[in-house]
Swiss-Prot record:
Organism of origin: Opisthacanthus cayaporum (South American scorpion)
Biological function: Inhibits voltage-gated potassium channels.
Protein name: Scorpine-like peptide
Disulfide bonds: 13-37, 23-42, 27-44
Entry's Gene Ontology molecular function annotations: potassium channel regulator activity; toxin activity
Length: 53
């Protein structure tokens, strides 16, 4: 199911690295945005240098 898929995506990042490019791919598919790894999490459209204002 979808929930398992999301959980799997969480595992694709390690040490801020998009291990297989899947973070990027999933974000492009879902939102048309670049994917960035923050630690072990994949975030769409938010580079590591991103700061909330």
């Amino acid at each position: 199911g979808l929930i398992h898929k999301v959980t799997k995506v969480q595992q694709l990042c390690a040490f801020n690295q998009d291990m297989a490019g899947w973070c990027e791919k999933s974000c492009q598919a879902a939102e048309g945005k670049n994917g960035y790894c923050h630690g072990t999490k994949c975030k769409c459209g938010k580079p590591l240098s991103y700061r909330r204002k």
